[in-house]
């Protein structure tokens, strides 16, 4: 039986829990662009660093698909935390991730979902919202830079999502073995990454997205097993 609980998205995570969480970040944070281990701040610098990409926003270990995992992400989020609602038939929420620390807050959010591929077999979807320059979505897409890069939005959009009752166009980014779409919502990049690439047919129709930071909504969210696609 899939665990389901009604969700009031007002965060209820204790401050002490966040203290434990950031202790984990210090030990295991990685670069959002390449997933190499990140070097923690020192007495001389408050910045996290990657040996390849320099100063970064640290990516914490994936959070389990649960109410606690969701509330922990929403609590510190400075960017949207986006979930398709209603969920596509048969799909479950399968985990969360975020990039940021106590000083900056969460500047990139990732929500993972798993379900049936419209063309057959299983599929996974990561929805990432991030400030420009963070690089989590671009890293998953296999792009060399932190953002979509040259040529972005130079053609007609390939798909559309609806956020807060406003349509947001998305463009397809070339990527091996997966379908990657990216657009802009409220000055943040929004990436939808789907495995396998045939699961991109899920976006043949506009996909409505909810920002889970909105404290007025109550959603009965179904949780599944943790998705291995989460970085």
Predicted features along the sequence, with ranges:
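Short, solvent-exposed coil/turn segments at beta-strand boundaries
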Residues: 88-90, 117-120, 184-189
């Amino acid at each position: 039986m899939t665990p389901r609980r009604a969700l009031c998205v007002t965060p209820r995570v204790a401050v002490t829990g966040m203290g434990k969480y950031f202790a984990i970040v210090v030990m295991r944070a990685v670069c959002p662009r390449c997933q190499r281990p990140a070097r923690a701040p020192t007495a001389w610098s408050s910045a996290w660093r990657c040996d390849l990409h320099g100063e970064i926003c640290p990516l914490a270990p994936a959070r389990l698909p649960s109410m606690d995992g969701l509330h922990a992400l929403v609590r510190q989020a400075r960017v949207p935390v986006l979930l398709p609602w209603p969920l596509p038939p048969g799909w479950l929420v399968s985990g969360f991730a975020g990039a940021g620390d106590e000083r900056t807050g969460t500047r990139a959010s990732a929500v993972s979902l798993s379900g049936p591929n419209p063309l057959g077999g299983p599929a996974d979807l990561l929805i990432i919202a991030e400030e420009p320059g963070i690089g989590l979505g671009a890293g998953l897409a296999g792009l060399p830079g932190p953002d979509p890069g040259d040529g972005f939005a130079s053609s007609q959009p390939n798909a559309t999502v609806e956020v807060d009752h406003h349509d947001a166009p998305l463009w397809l980014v070339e990527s091996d073995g997966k379908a990657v779409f990216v657009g802009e919502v409220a000055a943040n990049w929004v990436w939808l990454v789907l495995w396998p690439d045939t699961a991109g047919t899920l976006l043949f129709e506009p996909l409505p997205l909810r920002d889970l930071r909105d404290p007025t909504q109550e959603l009965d969210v179904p949780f599944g097993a943790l998705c291995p696609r989460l970085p």
